[in-house]
Amino acid sequence: MTDTATAPVASDSVAGVGRIVRVTGPVVDIEFPHDSIPPVYNALKTTITIGEESTEITLEIALHLGDDVVRAIALKPTDGLVRGQEVRDTGAAISVPVGDITKGKVFNVTGDILNNEGGEPIEITERWPIHRKPPMFDQLESKTQLFETGIKVIDLLTPYVQGGKIGLFGGAGVGKTVLIQEMIQRVAQDHGGVSVFAGVGERTREGNDLIMEMEEAGVFDKTALVFGQMDEPPGTRLRVALSALTMAEYFRDVKNQDVLLFIDNIFRFTQAGSEVSTLLGRMPSAVGYQPNLADEMGVLQERITSTRGHSITSLQAIYVPADDYTDPAPATTFAHLDATTELSREIASRGLYPAVDPLTSTSRILDPRYLGQAHYDTATRVKAILQKNKELQEIIAILGVDELSEEDKVTVSRARRIQQFLSQNTYMAKKFTGVEGSTVPLKNTIESFSKIADGDYDHVAEQAFFNVGDLDDVERRWSEIQKENG
């Protein structure tokens, strides 16, 4: 662990005991002796006893109010706390377990293991504090490198950056969970890396479904999961992304592995920050959000990066309130993103998966300086054909295909083949389709789409392009179709 990466942690020698002077929901004011006031971000502990049941709760110091009183945010419900009750300073910030021990485990914000009920006690050898400095400038990887996924539509049209941040938009039922699992599988299989999942404000049911689906798919043991559920206090939902990120940083910095960090949902991180800000009595800014929204987002996002050749690549699900992209919460997130992947319900309804919308998805490295001229030219031509086809759909709906010019008919025909070819048999979808997944090298993807755009495959039926890997699969499927048709 490098000293540049670790936030300062208070010494045990100054740890003291304070007493609660006020409780307002999840906000607790505590008075400490004058000579042992703990610093901001220190974790405090106290015990709530109701009947015969005792529960230890953790609080995090957010403000110093003066007169030896600190204001803390509770990370568990405060029902049962009373004035005068003792609170113990732990002498350090919240810390979480790190290392291989985290794989195949489900954690809460403070690093307690949630899926070891009745099992053998697990010995945790190392913990890292969740408040850490981003890597120093001279530690950053200066190269902008493509993160190759082997998924054609992503690699060609919305390429991901190694160590970048990708925004993932998608409603229910469009294949978002399958895409998450697919990326986890591919990081483990093709990049020798691990995945960390942060459930920020997750519905408990959704989190449970995700765990069961990951176990079925065989990717659970390659993943660490950290949950701050929807029913938990805002302090928990605000910090859970930092807990997950800390685990990811260990794999990057100590294990020298590439990591995929999935955050669902980054909007709920902002929402939790807004709730905490209001509870602390800060004056709200635009649309009621916290005044330090940009700073809070920056603290999280600046730690997601590449260092010394190893990276944390982050896939962040983003909820857009009322589809208003100018809302401060999504607008602040967009400033940090390197690529956006939008999953389309209309494309999913046609059975084309991954249901990525090639025209609304974007990437900052879709540029010949980063990808090379051949990749850029092919991607631009494919997008132009799809855009022209979209414009012609209105004419087709009113007048029919026959009324189009010969040139437009060719464009529509090629666009349909491209749309079919953008679909792909994925490893995670095998249980639905019965078709083995495929990883398509980027070079093959560029050559394949270039040939389709040139018209080299105009003679091949559209159905031969559906849910296949490369052009070899298309030719094989086309031969089978021809045999069936005699």
Curated annotation (Swiss-Prot):
Entry-linked InterPro entries: AAA+_ATPase, ATP-synt_VA_C, ATP_synth_F1_bsu, ATPase_a/bsu_AS, ATPase_alpha/beta_chains, ATPase_F1/V1/A1_a/bsu_N, ATPase_F1/V1/A1_a/bsu_N_sf, ATPase_F1/V1/A1_a/bsu_nucl-bd
EC numbers for this chain: 7.1.2.2
Positions contributing to ATP binding: 170-177
Keywords: ATP synthesis, ATP-binding, Cell membrane, CF(1), Hydrogen ion transport, Ion transport, Membrane, Nucleotide-binding, Translocase, Transport
Enzyme class name: translocase
PROSITE patterns in the cross-refs: ATPASE_ALPHA_BETA
Topology in membrane: Peripheral membrane protein
Catalysed reactions, semicolon-separated: ATP + H2O + 4 H(+)(in) = ADP + phosphate + 5 H(+)(out)
CDD domains per record: ATP-synt_F1_beta_C, ATP-synt_F1_beta_N, F1-ATPase_beta_CD
GO terms, molecular function: ATP binding; ATP hydrolysis activity; proton-transporting ATP synthase activity, rotational mechanism
Role summary: Produces ATP from ADP in the presence of a proton gradient across the membrane. The catalytic sites are hosted primarily by the beta subunits.
NCBIfam families xref list: atpD
PANTHER family, per database record: ATP SYNTHASE, ATP SYNTHASE SUBUNIT BETA, MITOCHONDRIAL
Record text on subunit structure and interactions: F-type ATPases have 2 components, CF(1) - the catalytic core - and CF(0) - the membrane proton channel. CF(1) has five subunits: alpha(3), beta(3), gamma(1), delta(1), epsilon(1). CF(0) has three main subunits: a(1), b(2) and c(9-12). The alpha and beta chains form an alternating ring which encloses part of the gamma chain. CF(1) is attached to CF(0) by a central stalk formed by the gamma and epsilon chains, while a peripheral stalk is formed by the delta and b chains.
Protein name: ATP synthase subunit beta
Organism listed in the record: Clavibacter michiganensis subsp. michiganensis (strain NCPPB 382)
Lineage: Bacteria, Bacillati, Actinomycetota, Actinomycetes, Micrococcales
Gene: atpD
